[in-house]
Amino acid sequence: MDLASKDSYIQRLASKVISQPDQERKKKQFAYPQGKRYNGPLNNNKKKGNRKSFKEKDTRGKTPGFPKKSLSSIQPTQKGAANKNGQKAQTQSINGSSTQALEGGNESKFSTVDILRKRLHEKIEESRGQGAPKDALSEAVQAKRAKRKLERERKKRKRKEFRMKELAQQNVEEQQPELKPKAVCESAATKRNVQAIIFNKVEMVEEGYVDKVQKKKNKKQSMKGNITPLTGKNYKQLLSRVEARNAKLEGLREKDEAKARDLEEKIKWTNLLYKAEGIKIKDDEEMLRTALKKKEQKRAQRKKKWAELSGNLAEKMQQRQDKRTRNIQKRKQLKTEKKKNKARKKGRVLPEDLKKAAV
């Protein structure tokens, strides 16, 4: 049970205790004749045996408990009984405190709700750690307080130092003049020259659209001595070009040997220039023939392999189709046989059975 529920329970209990005596019927004040005095409370109730009595509990030196029966009535004084000296009649309350009847019959009602509420608030404060400790001046408490004080001072000092550092840094920054770096736009070529190695960097060179005519012009300009280089992997075309060039040289040599020699030298120099640029020149007739032969052999092998593969594939497909048709026929026969057996069981005579019987 938590403290809030305890508090609500105690308040309900106290309200019952207080409200129960008040619920009794209030009696009208009786005016006594002159010469007579008040000797005690009147008791007009004839049924004295029905009245409840207090259960006296000695709770001296103990915290008040919560009794099972919260309602208790005070024993009434006998009719006409009065003390000459005005003695005090004591009755025990729920929490052990006594209520005293003063002289002249004026009763002082002692409220238990305030005491219970006070004790509950004290317990709540103790549980939160806000209440005053029992031994306020004990060594442990003093040591704890001193430790907390030192910690607070240390944190305060640290904050102050940090603030001072920040202020000093701001002053230094303000004193230094602001130097704006000059924005220098360097070209991609100069960057490449300055930085020999560039990692994780791709420089895109913007090139305009080049049409076919311009491409042809560029190709002609790149050609050296109006002689196209013999490059590529189309060995058949290269071989035909080499054969045509050799035939041209032979024809020119028959007419003019000097011109043929000049053309040969020109071809050699242009080939050397192309090779210097990194272009591989394929002008050897024998090597071109062997390369062409190898290429044709590979092509023939691939063709043969493909034919075998396609033939095997067609054969396999036909086998699968035949197997499928056989399985379908078998299933149909089984179905018809099943139907015939059912008919025979029912007593039907089939033409097949008659033929067998005749034989």
From Swiss-Prot:
The keyword Repressor does not apply. Residues 144-160, 295-305, 326-348 have a biased composition (Basic residues). One of its GO terms (biological process) is ribosomal large subunit biogenesis. One of its GO terms (cellular component) is nucleolus. Residues 15-106, 124-160, 295-359 are annotated as: Disordered. Residues 70-101 have a biased composition (Polar residues). Its main location: nucleus. Involved in a nucleolar function. This is Surfeit locus protein 6 homolog. It comes from Takifugu rubripes (Japanese pufferfish). The gene is surf6.
